[in-house]
Amino acid sequence: MRILQICSARQIGGGERHLADLANGLTRRGHDVFAALIPSSPLPPELSSVPKQNIVQVPMRSVLNVSSALKLARFASENRIQIIHAHVARDYPLAALVARRSSAHLILTRHVLFPMNRAHKLTLRRTDRIIAVSQAVADELRSQRIFSEDQIVLIHNGIDVDRFARGREDRFTNNKDADQNLRVGMIGHLAPIKGQEDFIRAAAIVCRRRRDVEFVIAGEDKSRSGEHRRRIETLIAELNLEQRLSLIGWVDDVAKLLSKFDLFDSPSRSEPFGLSIVEAMAAGVPVIATASEGAREIIDDRQTGRLVPIGDVEALAEAISGLLADCELRERLSAEAQRRVRERFSLERMLDATEEAYREVLQ
């Protein structure tokens, strides 16, 4: 199949990592994959399997950018594109116009729970399929009544499990070397919805109980003002955690970072899927997550991880303390979590399901 992936993202997050894995995986399977990106896109280095000549860079501010739409339509026609697949909501109307002018089929992936706007309702009726990355996202799409039941398909995000998996020996010990603390980490862009402040307050409680624990927050504040990072830094100082909690910014190699964690926490207030949760589980790191929409689909409490109520700092601190004190439980949760990821959230399963969605619309 000849497939054009469209993405105007300016930064890399979970959705962009998903796109890169999808494009590279489909290319390795023998499909002709193309990518339309904005000139400042950070994605080209991530598309390691996609031929460089298959990547086109065009401004994609909105569907009103007619010149870009016409350029992409010509590109799609000249390259005999069969499937146009868009991943960012602001790109959906543009992708719909390009698909219509080039006679290609239109596939969308929905990564978030936010309602679509009026432009989407007016332009997306002829979408062939919209992929929801979780049951929660699929339910939200149904509630908006833009797409029919036949148009909505559930395909969970998948990851390259082997890239994250590693040996678990020597990690699950109650007592490390004197100079080696236990490490609890979280990964996600700095924003109130991601729950960093709850994580910090829980860290303060745990630090009062144990001296051998340190905490790590990886991620950047994507806002122009940087206000949330400043709030986080202020809270860390107020709780006297400067020596116990590190803000390390954006990390390119997530698998390497996860290999340094003894526990992973996802304290989000809302999470449509939870790619970082799946990555941590694949890496064999026991996970504690708030019972957000996506986390409830991924984790069975006390079987493949721990779930705690959203916003309950005391419960989060208790879960962290409990797992740090019980190495046997950490090891059991880790093994079950890795098994769960291989069964349900592997890259191969995602590629199989996406290929099937493509084939269905081409029939």
Regions found by a protein language model. Give the residues of each.
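Conserved acidic donor-binding segment of nucleotide-sugar-dependent glycosyltransferases
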Residues: D301-R302, R306-V313, G322-E328
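Short hydrophobic beta-strand element within catalytic cores of glycosyltransferases
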Residues: A36-L37, P286-A289, I299
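N-terminal strand-loop element at the rim of the active site
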Residues: Q5-L70, F75, Q151-L154, S223, ...
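Acidic anion/phosphate-binding donor-loop and adjacent secondary structure
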Residues: V63-S67, D139-S143, D150-Q151, G158-N175, ...
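Aromatic "clamp/platform" in nucleotide-sugar-dependent glycosyltransferases that forms part
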Residues: W250, R269
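A conserved, positively charged/aromatic
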Residues: R100-Q135, D139, R145-F147
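A short, well-ordered alpha-helix in the C-terminal region of glycosyltransferases
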Residues: A315, G322, L329-R344, A353-E356
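A conserved mid-protein helix/loop that constitutes part of the nucleotide-sugar donor-binding site
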Residues: G13-D21, M186-R208, F215, R306, ...
